[in-house]
């Protein structure tokens, strides 16, 4: 599936931005899983729910919202956090509250310049429903180094 997405994305970028896209090292990180890991010679079963592995050298992706960009990070190996970092910005408000608070017009305004759905079915994903990704990244300076900040151009939400 990754290869298919890469191919479609490269074609889309080439058509719209007149430049070839090359993919280097893939970032393979997931955020809801269980793993066996050793800390101080003790084997543990670590559950990461909404968190990514950030062992020394691990590449990770910490997404913001539909309209705020994301970060590529490299883990620092902070054992006090069980080599973990947040998976994303995190919610500022519940999905239900976001649906009650915002309109499709708000969604369109907050995602201007981003190719994405802008209908009532995704209002709960509006950028204002999420914490500020820059503040979240700043709070994790002891967990990850920033490799790159990504600007959102396209957001696929089922």
Model-predicted segments: where are they?
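Domain-length cofactor-binding catalytic modules of enzymes
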Residues: 1-158
């Amino acid at each position: 599936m990754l290869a298919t997405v890469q191919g479609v994305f490269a074609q889309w970028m080439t058509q719209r931005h007149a430049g070839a896209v090359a993919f280097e090292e893939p970032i393979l990180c997931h955020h809801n899983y269980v793993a066996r890991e050793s800390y101080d010679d003790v084997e543990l079963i670590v559950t990461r729910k909404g968190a990514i592995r950030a062992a020394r050298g691990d590449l990770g992706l910490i997404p913001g919202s539909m309209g705020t960009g994301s970060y590529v990070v490299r883990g620092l190996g902070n054992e006090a956090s069980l080599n973990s970092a947040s998976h994303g910005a995190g919610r500022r408000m519940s999905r239900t509250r976001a649906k009650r608070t915002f309109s499709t017009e708000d969604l369109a305004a907050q995602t201007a310049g981003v190719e994405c759905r802008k209908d009532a079915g995704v209002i709960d994903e509006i950028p204002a429903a999420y914490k500020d990704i820059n503040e979240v990244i700043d709070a994790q300076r002891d967990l990850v180094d920033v490799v790159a900040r990504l600007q959102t151009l396209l957001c696929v939400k089922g």
